[in-house]
Amino acid sequence: MPTPPVEYRLTTRDAVLVRPSLALCEPLRRALQDSYVEHAPFLDWVTPQVNAEQVLRSLKGAIANYAVPLAEKRLFLLSADRAEVIGCIGLQPRGRGESYVIGYWASSRFAGQGYLSAALREVCGQLPRVRLYLTTSSANPRSQRLAEAAGFRLVRTLRGVRNDAWHGTQDTLIYRREPPA
């Protein structure tokens, strides 16, 4: 199973994609705190108040996961000066690592500027021999556009399987990106 490199230098944007480190604690806490309103309808793990202890615990777990072959591997997208967290991409291996489910989020401050799209394409390009999946809510057109911009195609719709206070009943859209032939 391919393991994500320590660092990616994005060629299309002025940003860097790195493995988790404890040095990300405060920039990550700020990004999550500032993005709560936008994330809450779609990410069930977000909380309205984010403290440093929660973020450190999460980062320690993310660091430890790199020693566990089938655990999720998170990559954080940082501004070029590494002062701000732009977003995060998680890679969850399936089976024996022949495919991954990808999750992602963007800081509200950087959303819609192409950073996460470039990072997702870069990560996918580093995993050319595996099938990649991601899911999104039918109520989240930004995430759908991001998936399609990164080369994913809608392969299945699970009707009415999501329900929340923000959007009511929604579908889950399953996207797949095949390895090149």
What role is predicted for each listed range?
Residues 40-61, 73:
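Conserved GNAT-fold acetyl-CoA-binding loop/helix
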Residues 1-27, 31-38, 74-181:
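Acyl-donor (CoA/ACP) binding surface of acyl/acetyltransferases
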Residues 65-71:
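Short loop/turn motifs at secondary-structure junctions and domain boundaries
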Residues 56-60, 67, 151, 174-176:
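Short alpha-helix boundary/capping motifs
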Residues 62-65, 162-163:
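Short, P/G- and charge-enriched loop/turn segments at secondary-structure junctions
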